[in-house]
């Protein structure tokens, strides 16, 4: 299977280029009016900087802002499953300079660049070069090959999916978030590393086609392109395997927009579907699903961590036996996010969703997780078995770390609600509320957030995050009970 990947990559590359070279055949009799391009295509690709628009505007768009955020963390007093390390950080601070520019180089060529430079401090962290992190989020060239056909080459943040809290078809999201600046999935998807790829897009009156080929790049450790200390490209996060994506959008039905995706990762196939349906002027129903070949979360987490020889909070010798095991069978497993959005006349939009992850932990696996954690705690309290206890607990907490970095639910059944109120109560005050519940153990996460815009350049924000539930539950077992985050953004 793996030996055929170079051939597959060459075929995919040829297909991507053909979109640009043979676009006219894709749109026999097409009206080239740009209003026919679906909004979700424009929002994620270079067509935003089209030559027609650029001729009446500046040849570039530049956005620069400074973000200063401080966070206070409040520890849960008693943990059923302790972490391997007792270095709980009670505070952290991040100041970031974020730059994004889109430049029209010629009538047919554009250049896009997005970068974030951050200085991060937290309790127990000694000042060093590791406090400084640079994330090159996007850098790519766009060729307007013909009419509404585009080819992108470089690091691109490809975003897929119609849901708000969990996107099963957002196939390039895994490990792409380097700094968790928010618990809001819609914010994280805009602030992550792109993937090095070549992407071709063709848009016509009744639909759109996108092809992506993303090669595996050597992820030998401690190289400038893999350095994870803050100065490298971190391609081990975004290009660790060869991946292909084909996406076809149909725009022929009134108020019904189907989108079909086919994705190959490391030789394994996945099929995805996005479907939206307008129900009147205020309600949009949607479903997003994916089915593909994979092991479960437990197995994938332990395989990944054992291969690297590192846990999120401790280090263990290679070959350490797994404290807990999942189903290592590679078979078809499905994920889904289904729900609706409701927008009222008072600038309030509420999304209610059900999330399903077949690869997530079942109630029985959660019981095994807590049972193994109790045993690890006993070993940790005994000096003779302390090292073993740390390794056991490290394996257990690596599962939590993996699910967070993979941006997928750790449990199988989740309820998600997000409400956004623009100009709430007073002008320029925006309120956001997020509620997420594990439907099996009834533990939940809740986040109220307020953002006040001081003119056009400055925004003040205040957010609280609460992780609540019984001691032996998903959210009730986390080290953090709650935290508060205050920030200020200044746009130049």
Give the role of each language-model region.
Residues 25-88, 100, 104:
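N-terminal periplasmic/intermembrane-space "pro-region" immediately following the signal or transit peptide
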Residues 68-78, 115-121, 157-159, 204-206, ...:
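Transmembrane beta-strands of outer-membrane beta-barrel pores
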Residues 89-95, 132-137, 192-196, 203, ...:
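Residues that define the transmembrane beta-barrel architecture of outer-membrane proteins
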Residues 95-103, 138-143, 198-202, 246-250, ...:
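Residues on the lipid-exposed face of transmembrane beta-strands in outer-membrane beta-barrel proteins
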Residues 102-218, 250, 469:
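Outer membrane beta-barrel
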Residues 107-111, 148-151, 206-211, 218-219, ...:
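Repeated loop/turn-to-beta-strand initiation elements of outer-membrane beta-barrel proteins
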Residues 177, 415-417, 478-492:
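Outer-membrane beta-barrel "beta-signal"
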Residues 255, 276-436:
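Detector for outer-membrane/organellar transmembrane beta-barrel domains
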């Amino acid at each position: 299977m793996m030996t055929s990947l170079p051939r597959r990559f060459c075929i995919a590359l040829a297909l991507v280029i053909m979109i640009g070279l043979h676009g006219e055949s894709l749109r026999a009799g097409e009206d080239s009016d740009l209003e026919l391009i679906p909004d979700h295509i424009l929002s994620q690709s270079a067509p935003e900087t089209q030559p027609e628009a650029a001729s009446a505007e500046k040849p570039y768009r530049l956005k620069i802002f400074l973000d200063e955020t401080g966070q206070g963390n409040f520890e849960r007093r008693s943990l059923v499953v302790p972490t391997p390390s007792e270095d709980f950080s009670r505070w952290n601070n991040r100041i970031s300079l974020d730059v994004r520019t889109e430049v029209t180089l010629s009538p047919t060529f554009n250049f896009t660049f997005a970068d974030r430079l951050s200085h991060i401090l937290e309790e127990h962290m000694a000042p060093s070069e590791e406090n400084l992190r640079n994330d090159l989020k996007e850098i790519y060239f766009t060729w307007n090959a013909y009419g509404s056909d585009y080819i992108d080459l470089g690091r691109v943040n490809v975003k897929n999916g119609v849901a708000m809290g969990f996107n099963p078809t957002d196939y390039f999201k895994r490990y792409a978030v380097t700094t968790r600046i928010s618990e809001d999935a819609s914010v994280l998807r805009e602030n992550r590393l792109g993937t090095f790829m070549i992407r071709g897009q063709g848009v016509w009156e009744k639909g759109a086609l996108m092809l992506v080929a993303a090669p595996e790049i050597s992820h030998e450790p401690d190289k400038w392109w893999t350095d994870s200390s803050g100065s490298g490209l971190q391609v081990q996060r975004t290009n660790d395997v060869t991946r292909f994506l084909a996406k076809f959008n149909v725009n022929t039905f009134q108020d019904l927009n189907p989108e079909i995706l086919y994705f190959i990762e490391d030789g394994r196939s996945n099929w995805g579907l996005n479907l939206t349906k307008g129900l009147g002027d205020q309600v949009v129903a949607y479903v997003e699903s994916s089915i593909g070949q994979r092991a479960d979360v437990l197995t994938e987490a332990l395989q990944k961590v054992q291969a690297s020889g590192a846990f999120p909070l401790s280090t263990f010798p290679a070959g350490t036996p797994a404290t807990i095991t999942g189903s290592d069978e590679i078979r078809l497993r499905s994920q889904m996010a289904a729900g609706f959005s409701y927008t009222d006349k008072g600038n309030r939009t509420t999304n209610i969703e059900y999330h399903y992850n077949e690869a997530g932990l079942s109630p029985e696996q959660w019981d095994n997780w807590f049972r193994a954690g109790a045993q690890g705690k006993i070993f940790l309290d005994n000096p003779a078995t302390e090292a073993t206890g740390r390794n056991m607990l490290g394996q257990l907490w690596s599962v939590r770390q993996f699910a967070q970095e993979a941006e997928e639910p750790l449990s199988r059944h989740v309820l998600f609600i997000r409400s956004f109120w623009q100009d709430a109560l007073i002008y320029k005050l925006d309120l956001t509320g997020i509620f997420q519940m594990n439907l099996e153990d009834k533990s939940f996460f809740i986040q109220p957030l307020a953002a006040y815009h001081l003119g056009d350049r400055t925004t003040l924000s205040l957010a609280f995050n609460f992780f609540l539930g019984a001691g032996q539950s998903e959210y009730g077992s986390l080290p953090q009970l709650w935290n508060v985050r205050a920030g200020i953004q200044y746009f130049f």
